[in-house]
Structure formats: C-alpha cells, structure tokens
Amino acid sequence: MTLHAILVTLIVPPPNLILVAILGFVLLRRSPRLARWLLGGALAGMLALSLPAVAQGLLVPLEWGLPRAPPPGAPPQAVVILSAEVDHVRGPGEQVRLGPLTLQRLVAGVALARRTALPVLVSGGRVGGKHVTPIAVLMADAMRDTFGLPPRWVEARSKTTWQNAEFSAAILKPQGITSVWVVTDAWHERRALLAFRHFGLTATPAPVEWDVDAGGWLPGARAWTVSYFAFHEWIGWVDYRLRAWLAGPPPAIAASNKAA
C-alpha cells in the first residue's frame, strides 16, 4: 500500500474517528477537558455517520449538477465501464470474482452499449497479487459469456480512477475516439469525469443510481458504508482537482492548445 493510500485510509471514517478517540484517551490525565471533548466528538461522529439521513446528506451532493446529455457537437463514440470491487473466493491460490458494484456497472454499461450500438472499453487492473486476474479481464469474460457482447478494448493495468482515465485515453485516442460515456456509480462520476477530462476525453456521465433510505434516523451498518463512500469520494475529488492543477494538461493536450 502506498503512502498516499495509507493517508487516505486514515482520514476517512471510521479510522479518523478512532484516531480521535485514541488521542482523547491519551490526554485524559494531561488535559481532561480536551480529552472529554475528543471522546465525545468521536462518539457523536460515529453515531451520526450511522444514520441513513446523514449518510445521504453527504452522498447526494456528489451527484448534483451532473450533465445528463452529451455536449453539442461531441457525441460519444464509445462506452467506458469502470470497475469497482471484487469478492475474494475461497480456494487454492488467489481467486476473485466480480463484486456487486462492479456487476451493477457492467449491467448498466451493457444496456447502454446495446441502446447506442457503441463499442465498449472495460477498465480495471489487479486487486491483489500478481497472479490475480485483473478486474477488466473478469468483466470482459462476463460480457462475452453472460451478455454475448464482448468489449472491443480491455484496459487491465489501472489501479485507481486516475489511471482508469489515463490508460483508457491512451487506448482510445489513437483510435480517433475523443468522446465517451463513462459508466460508474453516480457518487463516483464527479471524480471520474474530472480525471477523464484531464486526459483529453470529452466525458459524459452514465451514472448507476444507488438507492439510499432518505428518511431513516435509525443507526445501521449500510449507512456507515454510504458515509465511508461519501467521505472517500469528497477527499478523492479534492485530491484529483489538486493533482490536475499541479500537473497541468498532459503533453499532447498542452501541445495542441499551443498550436491552436
């Protein structure tokens, strides 16, 4: 795991709240008042993030303002389906299968490809050791064997959304493809679009909606999961904005802008 991944893990819940609670315990003797505030804040945060209404309040703004149609004059030329997670299967060696989120994206992407008659690129690298099958290969197998619609391209190197965009652009742009549908979860679209546009692709969202209980005020494990995704995406979006600003446009895009 990289230092960047470790830092991101520590600043999303529950690790961030656990760290606050640990700090509170450490300070109990030296600064009891501050310790009580830290412990109380950690407990209140854990309770709040387990409430469906709070979880949705964190997640839904990620979906606001997403365009629902391609920009004029730039119709998508391909469908890009991003991988999500895998489930590890018991057995000899490292075996994985497509997880629920990846399957939902795959189903939505196949439906879009059939509706638009556009070619498909699936994107996702290995999750685990070097002997684990890349997610994109599993997605391609499922498209061919289950849906009878094999993808035209398989991008099997990426480990992050940023790399999804970078490596997909490297495959598609030499083929003359500069505009794509991006199929991923609605809460993930904002960050994915930022990355794809940074690498010179006109990206139109094709979001997979995720049902969240809007009015629930009873704590639950699902709300914790939603809160985690929300924090992860907000942090990732800020990270990608900063990364794009620091990196500037890729060389090919910078050169074309200069020529123009």
Where are these regions (language model features)?
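Hydrophobic alpha-helical transmembrane segments
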Residues: 7, 19-20, 37-40, 230
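A structural signal for short, hydrophobic/glycine-enriched beta-strand patches
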Residues: 52, 56-224
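Extracytoplasmic/luminal low-complexity segments enriched in Pro/Gly and acidic/polar residues
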Residues: 238-260
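Hydrophobic membrane-insertion alpha-helices, especially the h-region
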Residues: 37-52
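Membrane-interface helix-boundary motifs at transmembrane edges
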Residues: 28-36
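Membrane-embedded alpha-helical segments of integral membrane proteins
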Residues: 1-28
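Hydrophobic alpha-helical segments of integral membrane proteins
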Residues: 2-7, 54, 58-62, 231-234, ...
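Hydrophobic residues within the alpha-helical transmembrane core of Major Facilitator Superfamily
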Residues: 22-23, 47, 238
